[in-house]
Amino acid sequence: MAEAIVSVTVQKLGQLLLEEPLFLFGIGDQVKQLQDELKRLNCFLKDADEKQHESERVRNWVAGIREASYDAEDILEAFFLKAESRKQKGMKRVLRRLACILNEAVSLHSVGSEIREITSRLSKIAASMLDFGIKESMGREGLSLSDSLREQRQSFPYVVEHNLVGLEQSLEKLVNDLVSGGEKLRVTSICGMGGLGKTTLAKQIFHHHKVRRHFDRFAWVYVSQDCRRRHVWQDIFLNLSYKDENQRILSLRDEQLGEELHRFLKRNKCLIVLDDIWGKDAWDCLKHVFPHETGSEIILTTRNKEVALYADPRGVLHEPQLLTCEESWELLEKISLSGRENIEPMLVKKMEEIGKQIVVRCGGLPLAITVLGGLLATKSTWNEWQRVCENIKSYVSNGGSSNGSKNMLVADVLCLSYEYLPPHVKQCFLYFAHYPEDYEVHVGTLVSYCIAEGMVMPVKHTEAGTTVEDVGQDYLEELVKRSMVMVGRRDIVTSEVMTCRMHDLMREVCLQKAKQESFVQVIDSRDQDEAEAFISLSTNTSRRISVQLHGGAEEHHIKSLSQVSFRKMKLLRVLDLEGAQIEGGKLPDDVGDLIHLRNLSVRLTNVKELTSSIGNLKLMITLDLFVKGQLYIPNQLWDFPVGKCNPRDLLAMTSLRRLSINLSSQNTDFVVVSSLSKVLKRLRGLTINVPCEPMLPPVDVTQLVSAFTNLCELELFLKLEKLPGEQSFSSDLGALRLWQCGLVDDPFMVLEKLPNLKILQLFEGSFVGSKLCCSKNLENLEEWTVEDGAMMRLVTVELKCCNKLKSVPEGTRFLKNLQEVEIGNRTKAFKDKLISGGEDFYKVQHVPCVVFENCEL
């Protein structure tokens, strides 16, 4: 990873030399020498990074280079911030100005000395590395990182998420057992060591068509070592209930929550998966909501067989076995050679020989095989496969697996997969160390943090319209393809990963590497009490700190935050306090001493006032102020607009991807926004909100909508009455959301001509007509949402030829005036969901007439 850090530092030094020569007056030569030395050392780092696991001496040299790069950035940043601060104070008196000049001269001399000292350190490391035999790389061959990532995205589809080898017979047996259960609660346990495929098997059962038909409701909850009863119960209830119940469920007291969930499970036939439950005590604190007399069933995954037998001694216990050599190669082949049909048979045979040598080192563990398969999928030649094989033999034998245990073996394989990551993707991987076990990470936030810290390198040569956010997404996709992170949710329209999480074994590797690289300090409240954890931060030189509270800590105020001296943590670059309850509702004043801070989040905290010292944070890139109540913003935040925004201000935001804008009903605003289309060529999501006043006429958005030709998502909150013609919409439009539009005419006359529409959401007041006919040309429609109050006058619905639509809308149950639903040309499975006893029958049971036309029998 040092290679990526040095590259960023070299780039920043180059920008300073080019853009700030006056600031560097007197020390420019020293800065240039430092840049040259870093460039030279960067040529050694590829070989050094690969040899770190073999030699502690090499590890120390790499760490020294990394720290020297950080130190150089910190020194120059601090100097420029101090100089800029003096400049802004505008000293007028001659003596004070003279003192300022003398101070700057002293500072320059001091900075120059520190830069020379860093350069000297690096020169000594370079000499030592040469003597040790570290090889110098004169440049990377082949594609650039961004190009290779993009090429792999096209040639390596998301096959990893669906592979199932060695579990086929177990799957069918467990599914049949599950759907043949009686009227008493039964627990099906999948038990085995980490990396054996327990969660993979549970997911296959959870989504099996027989299971989906048998049960009415479904819930999947990650439990993990830190089992918090309220959170688990809430997650189960939220999964099982309708979205309009969410706020009420979240407001329930613990006792009410347990009672209501118990009644719900007794009334309904539900399937609940408790993934990764660790101990008997966790089962004891959760089990009270599960009624004995019920058609519901529970699947739990655990590493502890005692937990499985304790939960239900008479239940179904399944213990997946290690893969055989043949099964191991089958899984590796599926992942590593997927999409390579054009490879010569002789090369495939050679790769198979190497692959079979490689899987022997995996000991039959599916996780290790899957991760290595993802690694080999990035290698296209026999020589590259052979090199991986040699490194595996070396790494596994020397990597600490002397006891031969499977856990140590898989840990070695996962560590090797990290070493093979491209340098900048390594930093993205290590950022997962910030998050607790089994945490579902929002990718947008993760990517924005990596961008803000300079971890995502700008792309010089790439296709038009590609942004730095796209490159960040590519980094994340690379981790997905290598099975180093697991996808939570994908965007239906764009297929981008929206949320993801990390397997706990992979997370252990992530934490280990993050510690080795001094990347982040993780404070875990299970290791020391809360106050000591926070106070310990005051003596640390970390640039990133993750405070992870456990054991109900979320219900208490963080009383020790005021004891932390941020003044001693000046190197900190990210401070994320999301969800914390801070005593007094105010951050300490010495937050302003964190002069290198790039990211500060007080999201969903009780902070009511920002300290005035926040104005000192000149390098701030991301400031998240989405708090629970009102927030006082001090006037130290210069040029921080808190009033209305002029649409013309958007003309400078040429890379904007999503825009939500509130307009008056005046045509001038529409003309201005329409003109933005000439500049906002990368806009993918647009939300337009116009006040719906009774006396005002409907809005004509034809010109505005047709101006943006690349939109993938469009949301309209306005009085419309009639949709624009199909020619007005972007051909890429995949999602359309309508609020308060008052549509009278059937919108499907237009919507059926939009070829890529996948999501249609109709909210309150969006349609006031009496008939909807969805009859043709909507083959790609996958999701259709109808909210309560959306179509109160609707009498008839026709659904035909929407072959990808998974079911009728959830909100169909709100359409009290609905008299007829006609469904045509659909599968038997779709039909079975809607007939009496079917999974979705509750949606249409109030409709007098449900007609199935030309459906499978």
Curated annotation (Swiss-Prot):
Protein name stated in the entry: Putative disease resistance protein At1g50180
Gene Ontology molecular functions: ADP binding; ATP binding
Annotated binding of ATP, by residue: G192, M193, G194, G195, L196, G197, K198, T199
Coiled-coil portions: 27-60
LRR repeats: 653-678, 680-703, 754-780, 791-816
Superkingdom of this protein's organism: Eukaryota
Gene Ontology annotations for the cellular component aspect, listed alphabetically: plasmodesma
GO biological process, one term: response to other organism
Keywords: ATP-binding, Coiled coil, Leucine-rich repeat, Nucleotide-binding, Plant defense, Repeat
Domain NB-ARC intervals: 148-461
A Pfam family: WH_DRP
Notes on the domains: The LRR repeats probably act as specificity determinant of pathogen recognition.
Gene3D superfamilies from the UniProt entry: 1.20.5.4130, Helical domain of apoptotic protease-activating factors, P-loop containing nucleotide triphosphate hydrolases, Ribonuclease Inhibitor, Winged helix-like DNA-binding domain superfamily/Winged helix DNA-binding domain
Role according to the record: Potential disease resistance protein.
Similarity section: Belongs to the disease resistance NB-LRR family.
